[in-house]
Amino acid sequence: MSNNIPLTKESYEALQEELKRLIREERPKVIQDIAEARSHGDLSENAEYDAAKNRQGFIEGRIQELQGKLARAHVVDLTGLKPDKVVFGATVTLYDTASEEEITYKIVGEDEADIKLGKISCTSPVGKALIGHKLDDSVKVKVPAGTKEYEIIEIKYE
């Protein structure tokens, strides 16, 4: 199993920005907050100090997490791909044969998935089922509610 984490360019850049913000802004601020809380005296009953230390732990943990993800990131370049096959990063419009409705999903990495924004993980049942299929293919997907059948009516790389 590969340790690479597939990411869209947008997601990679967003993670980089979050890391920069945490290092440049949040880390110095929490260090200042700890110093200020320490100056209030007794640390054993100092809620401000405890809160600042907890926040520092969260920030440092998130920094490590982001550094690890970015080090293992594989940015998927969709430039020049013909929109005839579903791959990671594709935006796919499906026709649900049961409900007779169209639905559009962008296939993204696990960290990027947000169903409210129409972004599904490449490891989700629908994402896994779609990858590798072509325009006009019929795809059956086992979901918790049963089996869904979709027809791929459009593939775009945005």
Swiss-Prot record:
Keyword Magnesium tagged: no
Coiled-coil residue windows: 1-67
Database matches in InterPro entries: GreA/GreB_C_sf, TF_GreA/GreB_CS, Tscrpt_elong_fac_GreA, Tscrpt_elong_fac_GreA/B, Tscrpt_elong_fac_GreA/B_C, Tscrpt_elong_fac_GreA/B_fam, Tscrpt_elong_fac_GreA/B_N, Tscrpt_elong_fac_GreA/B_N_sf
Keywords tagged on the record: Coiled coil, DNA-binding, Transcription, Transcription regulation
Pfam family, one: GreA_GreB
UniProt GO BP: DNA-templated transcription elongation; regulation of DNA-templated transcription elongation
Molecular function via GO: DNA binding; RNA polymerase binding
PROSITE patterns membership: GREAB_1, GREAB_2
Family statement: Belongs to the GreA/GreB family.
Function: Necessary for efficient RNA polymerase transcription elongation past template-encoded arresting sites. The arresting sites in DNA have the property of trapping a certain fraction of elongating RNA polymerases that pass through, resulting in locked ternary complexes. Cleavage of the nascent transcript by cleavage factors such as GreA or GreB allows the resumption of elongation from the new 3'terminus. GreA releases sequences of 2 to 3 nucleotides.
Alphabetized PANTHER family for the sequence: TRANSCRIPTION ELONGATION FACTOR GREA (PTHR30437:SF4)
Name of the featured protein: Transcription elongation factor GreA
Organism: Trichlorobacter lovleyi (strain ATCC BAA-1151 / DSM 17278 / SZ)
